Regions:
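C-terminal His-loop and adjacent cap/lid subdomain of alpha/beta-hydrolase
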Residues: 1-299
Length: 299
């Protein structure tokens, strides 16, 4: 292809799929279960700190929040304890080794990357009263490729076992992680790459796509060189690139037109039309303009 538009790309395959085990590993390690009601309460507190849902989902800044500030508050699931806050902070921090070195990125505080009953998201609670969570189905499927044990369940993974699984997957499938910035042949052939990612994506961490963009900048010697063939758009509030999340996303027509214009007519994309629609009626709820990513936007 002369042009590629990767929307909420499933790159860094090993890392983000195994990231679905992390919340369960945290609860297992700390011997404390965080209920869905308390989990939701933490999300609501993040939104409140940023001025409410609307303000939160339209901020271009990476949100930060310390769950310890909620200790002692009353939630629908009971009083928030130190143990609750410890689990929440560790989940937000993302997978890492015992010495603190990161394995991969977590999800931003305030982002709901889990569900109750519905097995969609990074992880889910099988029932509203569950005392255990489960990862997104692709996580265990991929992990079985790593261990070559088709019936392995990976329940009650310890932290050390999780890190070992993570390292084993990286070593075994290192050539298939879709994270290589050395796309020189594509670039030299005149190829153009557009990427976008919603900050409210519940399946793939937004920072993983930003990480790949930074690898491109490093590999090709700076942003000016990358600008000749690549554009990255980070859309606050947009879900998994579907335009019906909590903020507007780039439409298929706008994205494809921009890519075609760039590849066939040499017109580099700048601002792109984005929209938020009602998931059932299709009615337009919000419109806006997506702008190319700049480092000061999200640090």
């Amino acid at each position: 292809y002369n042009g590629v538009w990767a929307s909420c790309p499933a790159i860094n395959w090993n890392h983000f799929l195994l990231g679905g085990f992390w919340p369960e590993v945290v609860m297992q390690e700390k011997k404390h279960f965080l209920s869905s009601s308390k989990n939701r309460f933490f999300i609501e507190q993040v939104h409140e700190r940023y001025g409410g849902e609307t303000e939160f989902y339209h901020s271009t800044q990476k949100p930060t929040f310390d769950a310890d500030t909620c200790i002692g508050m009353r939630s629908p699931g009971g009083v928030i304890t130190q143990a609750d806050a410890d689990v929440m902070n560790e989940i937000w921090r993302g997978p890492h080794r015992r010495d603190g070195r990161p394995l991969w990125y977590g999800y931003y505080p305030g982002i709901k990357n889990w569900q109750v009953v519905i097995p969609i998201g990074t992880y889910y609670y099988p029932t509203p009263f569950s005392k255990k969570i489960k990862p997104f189905i692709l996580g265990p499927l991929y992990a079985r490729w790593i261990t070559e044990e088709p019936k392995q369940t990976f329940e009650d993974l310890t932290w050390d076992e999780y890190v070992e699984l993570f390292d084993q997957g990286s070593a075994k499938f290192g050539d298939n992680l879709a994270d290589d910035p050395c796309i020189d042949d594509f670039v030299q052939a005149g190829g153009k790459l557009m990427m976008d990612h919603g900050m409210d994506d519940p399946l793939i961490p937004t920072d993983g796509t930003i990480d790949y963009y930074r690898k491109l900048v490093q590999h090709f010697g700076g942003k000016a060189a990358v600008d000749k063939f690549c554009r990255l758009y980070i859309n606050p509030g947009d879900n998994h690139g579907n335009c019906w999340g909590n903020g507007p996303g780039i439409t298929q027509s706008a994205g494809m037109k921009a890519l075609v214009d760039w590849v066939e007519h040499g017109i580099a994309p700048t601002k792109l039309y984005k929209v938020r629609i009602h998931p059932k009626t299709g009615a337009i709820l919000e419109e806006g303009q997506a702008v190319p990513f700049e480092e000061p936007e999200i640090l």
